[in-house]
Curated annotation (Swiss-Prot):
Residues 198-221, 243-254 have a biased composition (Polar residues). Its main location: nucleus. It is found in: Nucleus. It comes from Arabidopsis thaliana. This is Transcription factor bHLH49.
Length: 486
């Protein structure tokens, strides 16, 4: 493609009126069969995908009413229609197509309409063949999306147009390299188109390695030598990158495959070296179970040890108290007869309790005996003596310490006898106590002897009998100074 065509295409891109005229054609245009004498070739232009796909049929656009009065996409269709047709034909010849090859046999497929308004600049002219359309759809030219979505877009899908552009470039190069002659039939053109579509479909798969394999001859023959070299270099770089990635992946897989048998071999060796193992699998399972159970056990022991240390550090007073208790228990064992033969603290305490209860019974029995032998020890003698003394001083000699209404079992004693007996009892009680061994008997005998002597003295005084002086002397002595005869 020459520079003039590029300039025209850029100017059309800048001018939005061209798009409006293409997308909104006038109402006078209609689709009908067009005479074969006025065939025109496709040139550099821009069109919507819907219009471009409609051009693949057996009909073309033309103005039946007035070709001279109607213009399309900035090209006037008046008296200069022949000149515009001629310019489009010359342009197609410059792009690599031969005019005789563009003319199909009568009654067969027709060509696209005026190139100034339908096709992009890099699209080449190719016949409207139904087989070509089917092959294009088969080779995923429209696989990027739905066909209806692509047609309904205002300027077409960019990916689909790019595929068409690539197909156009390859078709131009193929046609120029093959240099089709005028005398060749129309089937050769269709074969060339088939080859170009196959190559364009191969270029449309960038992810597959080796998809960018396009010969430099076909790209350079299309008139874009520099661009073809750049694309070929890019494809070579992609090839190299893809090969490097594939090699790296293969090496990584091989390393993994090598490491897996090594690990398996190490496990087998460990199983063989371990003793006391009836089976490799069972031993490995047991070892794993032991390893999994050991860490929590260690932690548990560690925690218990810490707790024991804490209790030991804070229980010194408790230990001292327990030691004292054990010492006292030993002392009780020594006191209780027969307790040394017993083993165990509980049994020893039972023996001590039984011994103490027996001692209590003995004490009660002895106290009962003492009460029967000396019953006067329970009275409050001092209170009684004080009351008697007051009554004796206040009353006359005829009065008695007992009331007159009280019946007396015995006759009243004389006044002197009562006073003397009370005084003697007071002396015996206030006398100092002797030691326990035989002291109680001596005190009792001293009291009774003093009473007897007083009774004898009183009897002699009442009968006016002069007693023996020795007896009087002995009677006047206190009871404490008397000697006890054996």
């Amino acid at each position: 493609m020459d520079l003039s065509a590029k300039d025209e295409f850029s100017a059309e891109k800048r001018n939005p009126d061209n798009y409006d005229s293409v997308n909104n054609p006038s109402g006078d245009w209609r689709v009908d069969s067009y005479p074969s004498e006025n065939l025109i070739s496709a040139g550099p232009a821009s069109c919507s995908p819907s219009q471009m796909m409609d051009s693949f049929g057996q009909t073309l656009w033309y103005d039946p009413t007035s070709v001279q009065a109607v213009g399309y996409a900035g090209f006037n269709g008046g008296n200069a229609s022949s000149s515009s047709f001629r310019g489009s034909i010359d342009r197609s010849l410059e792009m690599g197509w031969n005019l005789p090859n563009l003319l199909p046999p009568k009654g067969n497929g027709l060509f696209l309409p005026n190139a100034s308004s339908f096709l992009p600049p890099s699209m080449a002219q190719f016949p409207a063949d139904s087989g070509f359309i089917e092959r294009a759809a088969r080779f995923s030219l429209f696989s990027g999306g739905n066909f209806s979505d692509m047609v309904n877009q205002p300027l077409g899908n960019s990916e689909a147009i790019g595929l068409f552009l690539q197909g156009g470039g390859t078709m131009q190069g193929q046609c120029q390299s093959n240099e089709l002659n005028v005398g060749e039939p129309h089937n050769d053109v269709s074969v060339a188109v088939k080859e170009s579509t196959v190559r364009s479909s191969e270029q449309a798969k960038p992810n597959v390695p080796g998809s960018g394999n396009v010969s430099e001859d076909t790209q350079s023959s299309g008139g874009n030598g520099q661009k073809g070299r750049e694309t070929s270099s890019n494809t070579k770089k992609r090839k190299r990158n893809g090969q490097k990635n594939s090699e790296a992946a293969q090496s990584h897989r091989s390393q993994q495959s090598e490491e897996e048998p090594d690990n398996n071999g190490d496990e087998k060796r460990n199983d063989e070296q371990s003793p006391n193992s009836p089976g490799k699998k069972s031993n490995s399972g047991k070892q794993q179970g032991k390893q999994s159970s050991d860490p929590p056990k260690d932690g548990y022991i560690h925690v218990r040890a810490r707790r024991g240390q804490a209790t030991n550090s804070h229980s010194l007073a408790e230990r001292v108290r327990r030691e004292k208790i054990s010492e006292r228990m030993k002392f009780l064992q020594d006191l209780v007869p027969g307790c040394n033969k017993v083993t165990g603290k509980a049994v020893m305490l039972d023996e001590i309790i039984n011994y103490v209860q027996s001692l209590q019974r003995q004490v009660e029995f002895l106290s009962m005996k003492l009460a029967t032998v000396n019953p006067q020890m329970d009275f409050n003698l001092e209170g009684l003596l004080a009351k008697d003394a007051l009554q004796l001083r206040a009353g006359s000699s005829s009065t008695t310490p007992f009331p007159p209404n009280m019946s007396m079992a015995y006759p009243p004693l004389p006044h002197g006898f009562m006073q003397q007996t009370l005084s003697s009892i007071g002396r015996t009680i206030t006398s100092p106590l002797s030691p326990m061994n035989g002291g109680f008997k001596r005190q009792e005998t001293n009291g009774w002897e003093g009473d007897l002597q007083n009774v004898i003295h009183i009897n002699y005084g009442a009968g006016d009998v002069t007693p023996d002086p020795q007896a009087a002397a002995t009677a006047s002595l206190p009871a404490a100074n008397m000697k006890v005869e054996p």
